[in-house]
């Protein structure tokens, strides 16, 4: 039906007759000549119809936006005065000779020109129209190029694309599972995989030493801008490779991806330990484009007669951190109050501050509501340690260390944007040496997942002191976003059982949930390591989209619904009976009953 894509026509086709198909992006009648902008996935081309061909001209005059048409015509150069440098095809146009309406379009339920006027609900309900927009089409085409490049790289490096099951068993990976009832085994359920983690480890035990898969994963969790109930991972696992070798190989893949598709050389990725990242940036995925850093000042404030400072300063689990903002002394009291409310979102009880109005004037040049509690020596030490200059402001967070890190880390990001301090476009790094466990409500939880290996300890040593053990794990971070995370896996049953015990998973529960894994670990399991990248997030960053919904063909809403298909929906009662499922209606209790 066509000889070329609309967006591919250029000066090399001058004088050629072409056949194009696509949608009418815009139609206008200027002085008895009809101009059509015809659109397909590759872009736009201008088609001109003269009144000399009356029948064809009449059809062209009747066209409206989003009519699906076939055009035949002659490629010619545009007059110099009409060249459009904003269009890929802006140097040429097609003189229309033939025109067939393949399908007319009803009046559109959303705007194609001003998509900002369309609600998110409208865009998802009429996604097939929203995806016709060049911006959306370009993102999906770019996504296809990324997956193609990833496959080429992994294939050429000896990795095998192997599928793993979608109907599987529930495992504790940090989010709720999507459950699928079994008709054959009434009362029992499959779970959709949150990741192929255990199956890819089993593949390593099977001798397939380099595996990959671009795979759908499912998590029933509360959604944010960068989360969806179903998402896509670039899943990788290797045998007989160290964490260093995995990082080198996957960094090579990511650098190649950016160079090939964006012509960006990311350079060598620096390494940073988890502890350093939390200390300097209050985050395990720091945005290194932001030059602001947190500075510990607790040792300077242990003796001050101000409980807000000396309490956390003398608490083993406390922290007092300072954040210097260059030229921040211009902040008004209202702006500082807004920052105080902002850190309150993250659990901080307040925000102390100190303006350096005139460094040369000593204490007279300092403005702060807490200045009366501080000696000149302490103030000078704080200024020296933070590197503050005249015109700067220093903001203080004082609380439990985890609260300070989260609140001041978030404030660091906000201040960096507010003061337009971000430097450079791309700043990648590896974060390494994560804690094995974190304590929540008195119990230990795996920082990554229960199959992550500790670094350099035996099972007995791990159980003797789990709180201070480091995992052999690594995260790839870019501009404050985690692109992917991985680790060396546990490859012997003794260590795996020890980790389960630390996590409070009793032997019977471990056998019921992971008996197949513990059994497999008994039969010559090789050392193995891997990593999984979030494909949707990578595409979002590379295309500059603000949400992963804008780089997925058919995403869900923030309430995990699909306006296009009205999913989820109610099941047929006969199906429920066959599955042995009865839906229990929520009973609303009246006030006072």
From Swiss-Prot:
Q: Which reaction does it catalyse?
A: tRNA(Asp) + L-aspartate + ATP = L-aspartyl-tRNA(Asp) + AMP + diphosphate
Q: Can you tell me which residues bind ATP? A: 219-221, 228, 482, 534-537
Localization (cell): Cytoplasm
InterPro entries found in the cross-reference section: Aa-tRNA-synt_II, aa-tRNA-synth_II, aa-tRNA-synth_II/BPL/LPL, Asp-tRNA-ligase_1, Asp-tRNA-ligase_1_N, Asp/Asn-tRNA-synth_IIb, AspRS_core, GAD-like_sf
What Gene Ontology molecular function terms does this protein carry? aspartate-tRNA ligase activity; ATP binding; nucleic acid binding
The question of whether Cytoplasm is a record keyword is answered with yes
Task: Extract the ranges annotated as region (Aspartate).
Answer: 197-200
GO biological processes: aspartyl-tRNA aminoacylation
Q: So what EC number does this one have?
A: 6.1.1.12
What's an example GO cellular component term for this entry?
Answer: cytoplasm
Identify the PROSITE patterns for this entry: AA_TRNA_LIGASE_II (PS50862)
Q: Which domain of life is it from?
A: Bacteria
Please state which protein family the record places this protein in.
Answer: Belongs to the class-II aminoacyl-tRNA synthetase family. Type 1 subfamily.
Q: Which PANTHER family match?
A: ASPARTATE--TRNA LIGASE, MITOCHONDRIAL (PTHR22594:SF5), ASPARTYL/LYSYL-TRNA SYNTHETASE (PTHR22594)
Q: How would you summarize the oligomeric state and partners of this protein? A: Homodimer.
Quote the NCBIfam families the UniProt record gives: aspS_bact, PRK00476.1
Job description of the protein:
Catalyzes the attachment of L-aspartate to tRNA(Asp) in a two-step reaction: L-aspartate is first activated by ATP to form Asp-AMP and then transferred to the acceptor end of tRNA(Asp).
Q: What is this protein called?
A: Aspartate--tRNA ligase
Cite the source lineage: Bacteria, Pseudomonadati, Pseudomonadota, Gammaproteobacteria, Alteromonadales
Gene for this protein? aspS
């Amino acid at each position: 039906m066509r000889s070329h894509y609309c967006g591919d026509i250029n000066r090399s086709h001058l004088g050629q007759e072409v056949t194009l198909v696509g949608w009418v992006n815009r139609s206008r009648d200027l002085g008895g000549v009809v101009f059509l902008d015809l659109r397909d996935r590759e872009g736009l081309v201008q088609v001109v119809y003269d009144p000399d061909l009356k029948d064809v001209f009449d059809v062209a005059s009747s066209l409206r936006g989003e009519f699906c048409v076939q055009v035949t015509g002659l490629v010619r150069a545009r007059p110099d005065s009409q060249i459009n440098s904003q269009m890929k095809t802006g140097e040429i146009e097609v003189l229309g000779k033939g025109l067939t309406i393949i399908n007319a379009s009803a009046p559109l339920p959303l705007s194609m020109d001003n998509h900002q006027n369309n609600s998110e609900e409208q865009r998802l309900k009429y996604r097939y129209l929203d995806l016709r927009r060049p911006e959306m089409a370009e993102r999906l085409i770019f996504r296809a190029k990324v997956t193609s490049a990833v496959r080429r790289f992994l294939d050429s490096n000896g990795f095998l694309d192997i599928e793993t099951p979608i109907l599987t068993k529930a495992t504790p990976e940090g989010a709720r599972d999507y459950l699928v009832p079994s008709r054959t085994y009434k009362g029992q359920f499959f779970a959709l995989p949150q990741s192929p983690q255990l199956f890819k480890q089993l593949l390593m035990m099977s001798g397939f030493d380099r595996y990959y898969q671009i795979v759908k994963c499912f998590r029933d969790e509360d959604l944010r801008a960068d989360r969806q109930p179903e998402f896509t991972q670039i899943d990788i696992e290797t045998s007989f490779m160290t964490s260093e070798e995995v990082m080198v190989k996957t960094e090579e893949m990511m650098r190649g991806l950016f160079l090939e598709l964006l012509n960006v050389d990311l350079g060598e990725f620096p390494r940073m330990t988890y502890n350093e990242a939390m200390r300097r940036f209050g985050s395990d995925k720091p945005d290194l484009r932001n030059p602001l850093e947190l500075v510990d000042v607790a040792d300077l404030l242990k003796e001050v007669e101000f409980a807000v400072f000396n309490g956390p300063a003398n608490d083993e689990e406390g922290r007092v951190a300072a954040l210097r903002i260059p030229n921040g002394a211009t902040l008004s009291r209202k702006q500082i109050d807004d920052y105080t409310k902002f850190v309150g979102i993250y659990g901080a009880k307040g925000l102390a501050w100190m303006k350096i109005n005139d460094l040369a004037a000593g204490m007279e040049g300092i403005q702060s509501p807490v200045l009366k509690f501080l000696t000149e020596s302490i103030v000078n030490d704080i200024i020296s340690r933070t590197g503050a200059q005249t015109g700067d402001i220093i903001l203080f967070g004082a609380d439990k260390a985890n609260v300070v890190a989260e609140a001041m880390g978030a404030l660091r990001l906000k201040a960096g944007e507010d003061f337009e301090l971000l430097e450079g476009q791309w700043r990648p790094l590896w974060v390494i040496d994560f804690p094995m466990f974190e304590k929540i409500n008195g119990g230990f939880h795996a920082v990554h997942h229960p199959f992550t290996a500790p670094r350099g300890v035996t099972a007995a040593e791990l159980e003797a002191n789990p709180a201070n053990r480091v995992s052999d794990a690594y995260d790839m971070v870019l501009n404050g976003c985690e692109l992917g995370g991985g680790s060396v896996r546990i490859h012997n049953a003794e260590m795996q059982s020890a980790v389960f015990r630390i996590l409070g998973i009793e032997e019977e529960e471990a056998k019921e949930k992971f008996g197949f894994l513990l059994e497999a670990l008994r039969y010559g399991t090789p050392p193995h390591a891997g990593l999984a990248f979030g494909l949707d997030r990578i595409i979002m960053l590379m295309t500059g989209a603000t949400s992963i919904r804008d780089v997925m063909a058919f995403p869900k809403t923030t309430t995990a619904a699909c306006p296009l298909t009205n999913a989820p929906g109610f099941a047929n009662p006969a199906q429920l009976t066959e599955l042995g499922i009865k839906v229990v209606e929520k009973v609303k209790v009246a006030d006072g009953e």
